[in-house]
UniProtKB/Swiss-Prot annotation:
Binds 1 FAD per subunit. Binds 1 heme group per subunit. Its EC number is 1.7.1.2. Induction: By nitrate. Nitrate reductase is a key enzyme involved in the first step of nitrate assimilation in plants, fungi and bacteria. Its cofactor is FAD; heme; Mo-molybdopterin. It comes from Hordeum vulgare. The keyword Cytoplasm does not apply. This is Nitrate reductase [NAD(P)H]. One of its GO terms (molecular function) is FAD binding. Mo-molybdopterin binds at residue 168.
Length: 891
């Protein structure tokens, strides 16, 4: 909160020349024809008499939008201080913040977008910047390296101001993800905004510093201030060719104002790069360094982001053949694109005597890159057989070099009766270089630059009794919002594929003989829920019949089905479990020339885990890290916080900063590491939201050596993680578990559907984490998820409680949805007023604080020490009417 106050203080106190406040700064500069020139050598002489247009008439009336606020979803993140507009559609969960405005809202403001509604692309936390101490360093191949203060940038150079349309290279990516999942998240068609930017020319700054000639310096590199979790923990950086940076026709600026106000935190306060006609990924925010160099930027993000790879290239091939480093795959200038905005998604046009008497007006936007003017937009109602030319509106005037940096708007009138006979409408645009849009979508690994025809389906509906209407269906809706004809089409295709590939079990009784021998190739064929075989210490086991009874759920077996899992089995199972396994033994493994040796395989694995890691940046084949439950995912520790003397919050970076973990709510992961030459695996439930991008967080209690006489060695994995240095790798495997919360009270338990309007939750100690995950999911989906939750949380003392602060905050904010009762064995601090229970969780506690069962609408979720569950919780719930087989879900 203090950071937000400090930001407001900075932009109102002294971020500008001493005689100008932010809103008055426009007057200071424009009154002198664009700002007083400090050095005639810094700018072209033909700019002396140029007077920039007064853009205030465009953006001032449109700044009146409802205020941005601190979003509760940001409370537990490093962005808690940043105010954001509530209308923005979040695309990547809580953090980092990536969003776009709803398309109808965006278009309602016309040419200039209010800053609070401008789309946002952040890779990590928003830096807390101080105008008075912020500097931009210019170094490298320059004669006079300088660190400019913001005061020096504002007062030392001629200011320029003009509108620019910014577009993310991932605009319309969700359409690509409906065809095949790319490595990026779901941008809709709203990743575009136009605002008026004020700043200083980059070429003026470079010339002031004595930039060397093109023969010596070929590139200008930019680096931001934010420390990012992915890509080896580097800062965001990229570069431009020197010829672009120094070209007066390109209008590259270092911007410090947007729509007449200082930059907002999400948009780069106090200064950022603006490169008109380029993708947003080249416009570094929170600019700290400019390096003139011979070579391109060495930043991870310069090579591993903003590329269009050929459609046949997946992540594995991209890494193997170094496609990331091929210059022809780099995106700089925007391509030609257009979108239908009217009719809107789910808009209904009634067909009656009134509506058929006048034409319907279709509308939309179009843009192109490199300053190229959009010269024509066409609409078709018959799949491209015929086209109707639209009216174009270009609110901007070209620059003196003939460049167009902004979007334009198109409209066309169509007869309603024509719409009645059409199945879809589509739009395409042309620019002055005669570039146009392809008819069909061209998939690429990163889901970038999608610009196929924008198609809206037309369906007949009955909006009112006895009335016929047309309902319009856009391809997708942004983020995780449902809707769109592409989503429905994908669902139908998936269902048909699933029905066509279902097979009956191939696990047959005659295999149950210990004398049988199998090769590894034969074992690999049994890797499904219909037939799940594993190899442990050279023995082959058919675990198919045990899937439904496994305490950890079927997933724990299925992630290893068809493989030799000796090391993983030993890492997490007791001698008793090994004895139980024998009843499922069907034979022995024989090794052929084409099969590997389990012993050598285990030795090799240990050697690999112990060996120093070679960091090879790569992008995943999927937008989720846990795309294949059978494969371990290498993650790196990027942050570790001590929450108490024995509780740590670990943050691990996923392989790609644009990935989600891919863990369904209710399931957990295995963390794998080699300690003492042996594989150690432990199950943990992340506390980070399933929507988090680029990282996963685990809250873990450390069981130290010699603290508990029953376990003198302490916790092997927890102590290992506590000693793990930043940057060190661990492997994560999953998802694992038999319980999945699908939202709005729906659960899947071992493949069966369950539903509840009320949840009776009981947790003990670290067993709070899966329960916490469900609470988080329910509250995140408000107001759609109306599930009522009652939680009893037991610990030895108050200090042993995990996540209490957040649970209390949720309960206070949602008193009708979440009711919490704590129980401690003893009050650790008698001087503190303890208003909850003391003692053990028994039937009386459960009856007082949980709803009764047996009504078909209440489920119990339980996780904690086995003694607590078996001796008190389960018997108590049974007496309260819960069917322990159907109504009591144990994580």
């Amino acid at each position: 909160m203090a950071a937000s106050v400090e930001y407001n203080r900075q932009v109102s106190a002294h971020p500008w020349p001493t005689n100008a406040q932010p809103k008055a700064a426009f007057d200071l500069f424009s009154s002198s024809g664009g700002g007083r020139r400090r050095s005639g050598a810094d700018s072209d002489s033909d700019d002396e008499d140029s007077v920039p247009p007064d853009w205030r008439s465009l953006y001032s009336p449109r700044l009146d939008v409802e205020p941005s606020v601190k979003d509760p979803r940001d409370e537990a993140t490093s962005d808690a201080w940043v105010k954001r507009h509530p209308a923005l559609v979040r695309l990547t969960g809580k953090h980092p913040f990536n969003s776009e405005p709803p398309l109808p809202r965006l278009m309602s403001h016309g040419f200039i977008t209010p800053v609070p509604l401008h789309y946002v692309r952040n890779h990590g936390a928003v830096p807390k910047a101080d105008w008075s101490t912020w500097t931009v360093e210019v170094t490298g191949l320059v004669k006079r390296p300088v660190k400019f203060t913001m005061e020096e940038l504002v007062t030392g150079f001629q200011a320029v101001e003009f509108p620019v349309t910014l577009v993310c290279a991932g605009n319309r990516r969700k359409e690509q993800n409906m065809v095949r999942q790319s490595s990026g998240f779901n941008w809709g068609p709203g990743a575009i905004s136009t605002t008026v930017w004020r700043g200083v020319r980059l070429r003026d700054v470079l010339r002031r510093c004595g930039v060397m000639g093109a023969g010596a310096a070929s590139n200008v590199c930019f680096e931001g201030a934010e420390d990012l979790p992915g890509g080896g923990g580097c800062k965001y950086g990229t570069s431009l060719r020197r010829s672009v940076a120094m070209d007066p026709a390109r209008d590259v600026i270092l911007a410090y104002m947007q729509n007449g106000e200082p930059l907002a935190p999400d948009h780069g306060f106090p200064v950022r790069v603006i490169v008109p006609g380029f993708i947003g990924g080249r416009m570094v925010k929170w600019l700290k360094r400019i390096v003139v160099a011979c070579n391109e930027s060495e930043s991870y993000y310069h090579y591993r982001d903003n590329r269009v790879l050929p459609s046949h290239v997946d992540a594995e091939l991209a890494n193997a053949e170094a496609w990331w480093y091929k210059p022809e795959c780099m995106i700089n200038e925007l391509n030609i694109n257009s979108v239908i905005t009217t009719p809107g998604h789910d808009e209904v046009l009634p067909i009656n005597a009134l509506t058929t008497q006048k034409p319907y007006t279709m509308k939309g936007y179009a843009y192109s890159g490199g300053g190229r003017k959009v010269t024509r937009v066409e609409v078709t109602l018959d799949g491209g057989e015929t086209w109707q030319v639209c009216d174009l509106e270009h609110p901007e005037r070209p620059t003196k070099y003939g460049k167009y940096w902004c979007w334009c708007f198109w409209s066309v009138e169509v007869e309603v009766l024509e719409l009645l006979g059409a199945k879809e409408m589509a739009v395409r645009a042309w620019d002055e270089a005669l570039n146009t849009q392809p008819e069909r979508l061209i998939w690429n690994l990163m889901g970038m630059m999608n610009n196929c025809w924008f198609r809206v389906k037309i369906n007949v509906c009955r909006p009112h009794k006895g009335e016929i209407g047309l309902v319009f269906d856009h391809p997708t809706q942004p983020g995780n919002q449902s809707g769109g004809w592409m989503a429905r089409q994908k669902h139908i295709e998936t269902s048909e594929t699933t029905q066509g590939t279902l097979k009956r079990s191939t696990s047959t009784p005659f295999m149950s003989t210990a004398s049988a021998q199998f090769t590894m190739s034969e074992v690999r064929r049994h890797a499904s829920k219909d037939s799940a075989w594993i190899v442990v210490h050279g023995h082959v086991y058919d675990c198919t019949a045990f899937l439904k009874d496994h305490p950890g759920g079927a997933d724990s077996i299925l992630i290893n089905a068809g493989s030799d899992c000796t090391e993983e089995f030993d890492a997490i199972h007791s001698a008793k479990a090994r004895g139980l396994l024998e009843m499922y033994r069907v034979g022995e493994l024989i090794v052929t020339g084409n099969d590997y040796s389990p012993q050598s395989s285990n030795a090799d694995l240990a050697a690999i885990v112990e060996a120093p890691a070679v960091v090879v940046p790569r992008l995943p084949a999927s937008a989720v890290a846990l795309a294949n439950p059978r494969e371990k995912v290498r993650c790196r520790l990027v942050d570790k916080k001590s929450m108490s003397h024995n509780v740590r919050l670990f943050r691990f970076a996923l392989p790609s900063p644009d990935q989600k973990l891919g863990l369904p709510v209710g399931k957990h992961v295995y963390v794998c590491a080699s300690t003492g030459g042996k594989l150690c695996m432990r199950a943990y439930t992340p506390t980070s939201s399933v929507e988090e991008v680029g990282h996963v967080e685990l809250l873990i209690k450390i069981y130290f050596k010699d603290e508990d006489p029953k376990f003198p060695a302490g916790g092997l994995m927890s102590q290992y993680l506590d000693a793990l240095p930043l940057g060190a790798p661990v492997d994560i495997k999953g998802p694992v578990g038999h319980i999945e919360y699908a939202g709005r009270g729906a659960f899947t338990v071992g493949g069966e559907r369950r539903f509840a309007r009320r949840l009776a939750m009981v947790a003990g100690g670290t067993g709070i984490t899966p329960v916490y995950q469900v609470i988080q999911a329910v509250l995140r989906d408000q107001p759609d998820d109306t599930t009522e939750m009652h939680l009893v949380y037991a610990n030895r003392t108050e200090d042993d409680m995990l996540l209490r602060e957040e649970i209390d905050r949720w309960a206070a904010a949602n008193p009708a949805r979440l009711k919490v009762w704590y129980v401690v064995s003893k009050v650790g601090r008698p001087e503190d007023a303890w208003e909850y229970g003391v003692g053990r969780v028994d039937e009386q506690v459960l009856r007082e604080h949980l709803p009764l069962g047996g009504d078909g609408e209440t489920l119990a979720l339980v996780c904690g020490p086995p003694a607590m569950l078996e001796c008190t919780v389960r018997p108590g719930l049974e007496k309260m009417g819960y069917d322990l087989d159907k109504d009591c879900l144990v994580f």
